[in-house]
A protein has these predicted regions:
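An accessory alpha-helical subdomain
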Residues: 158, 162-164, 170-204, 214, ...
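Short, amphipathic C-terminal "tail helix"
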Residues: 213-236
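Catalytic cores of RNA-modifying enzymes
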Residues: 1-181, 220, 229-232
Length: 236
């Protein structure tokens, strides 16, 4: 993942240390977050003598990564092989702490990685594409076949490198509101925006027209810049 010895590396879900060992060979210390206490003795055994490993037994979805960055004295680099069932919620959780995270190297099921890196108008484009794309630069760096794992899963995996942009792709007045607008637009995928955004605004058609966006368009056709502009034009 291109880390330097002095980097503050946090590994989420190290399991039995398949990634942890090579990481410890590259950096001075690794901070690992592992919920499954049954794995900890084997993890410690397999990484003994390689480097300094700190392990916290906690649910990553409950971790305040801003606090972790303050404690470790600088921006974090996150490394993780994410279980499919928590990959989207965890990514959205990490996104909240973007000011404290310089970059992330994450392994997802291929389908999720493609959604994150998707362009407007493509089938995979959705909430994750827009929210990540505003603040992060996403690039699929590697695809991993099922045969790389024991037991092999039924799907391909992909490694995604997410680097924080120097500035958001488009100016956003209220980040929380932007997130709500994006969720609203994609909440009912096949609906046109004037219908999909009814939950957010008493007069969605007027709001869209005020933003210069055709109310008959669907969420998957809007660029990240258009989403930002739409959110900025919101007046309840």
């Amino acid at each position: 993942s291109g880390v330097m010895p002095e980097d503050r590396v946090v590994e989420i879900g190290p399991g039995l240390g398949a990634l942890t060992r090579p990481l410890l060979a590259q950096v001075n210390e690794v901070w690992a977050i592992e919920l499954d206490c049954d794995l900890l003795p084997q993890l410690m055994e397999r990484t003994r003598g390689v480097g300094v490993l700190h392990v916290e037994q906690v649910d990553a979805l409950r971790v305040d990564f801003g606090e972790v960055a303050r404690r470790l004295g600088g921006e974090l680099r996150i490394v993780a092989n994410l279980p499919y069932n928590i990959s989207s919620p965890l990514l959205l959780h990490l996104l909240k702490y973007r000011a404290s995270i310089a970059e992330m190297t994450l392994m997802f099921q291929s389908e999720v990685a493609e959604r994150i890196a998707a362009s407007p108008g493509s089938k995979a484009y959705g909430t994750l594409s827009v929210l990540c794309g505003l603040w992060l630069e996403a690039r699929i760096v590697m695809t991993v076949p099922p045969t790389a794992f024991r037991p092999p899963p039924k799907v391909n995996s992909a490694v995604l490198r997410l680097v924080r942009r120097p500035a958001p792709l488009a100016p956003v007045n209220d980040p929380d509101h932007f997130v709500q607008v994006v969720h609203g637009a994609f909440g009912q995928r096949r609906k046109v925006l004037s219908n999909a955004l009814k939950v957010m605004h008493p007069a969605p058609r007027e709001w869209l027209q005020h933003a210069g966006i055709d109310p008959e368009r669907r969420g998957e056709t809007l660029t990240i810049g258009e989403f930002a502009h739409l959110a900025n034009c919101f007046q309840p």
